[in-house]
Amino acid sequence: RSDKISVEDPYFQTHINLMEFRGLKPIPIPVTQDGIDIEKLKKQKKIKGVLVTPCHQYPLGYVSSAENNEKLLAWAKTEGAWIIEDDYDSELRYGKKPLPALSSYKEGAPCIYLGSFTKVIYPGFNMAYMVVPKNLITVFEGAELLIDRHSSEVHQYILAEFIQNGFYYSHVRRLKKIYEKRRQAAVRAIGKYLSAYGHIEGANEGTHLTFIFNHP
């Protein structure tokens, strides 16, 4: 207990609440436009892992650069720490190719990948997934049996068919067109009525906008 886990700052409060509930100690690390600040991360001692959202940082919307990702992987290898990648909002990149998962950068990278279907199916569709190294599969299977007793098997079978038959990918393509138009409309409205008060921060993707006021 009391293991230290680094998190991006600003962060998703639920992540902090969950860590503290489990007896972990969250260590906030500032985020830059290139991703989590590696130099500040290196100054921390005895960090067991780091939770990052490299594809679309919440709440600022930054996308971690490939160079920063490489540095993060190198840090994890040196420290013997785990990287937990929450692939938040990654499907909805407008006019851009999907970004590779951190584990794809290097074989054997100490990464645990988290994904969810909530953003692209519907908000109440609470089904998520994890991709873990082979040596951790048994551990996570045991944990899943203890903490997840309510996931609908029917929903899982339907989703599997939806993906295998190619419907999921065409569905995501349609969603991207819809959300891109909505985002563009929101950006235009903000530019017209609020530009004197601040600016939009982050990349042009995902389902949320972050507006930074000039004078908080």
Predicted regions and their residues:
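PLP-dependent class I/II
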Residues: R1-P216
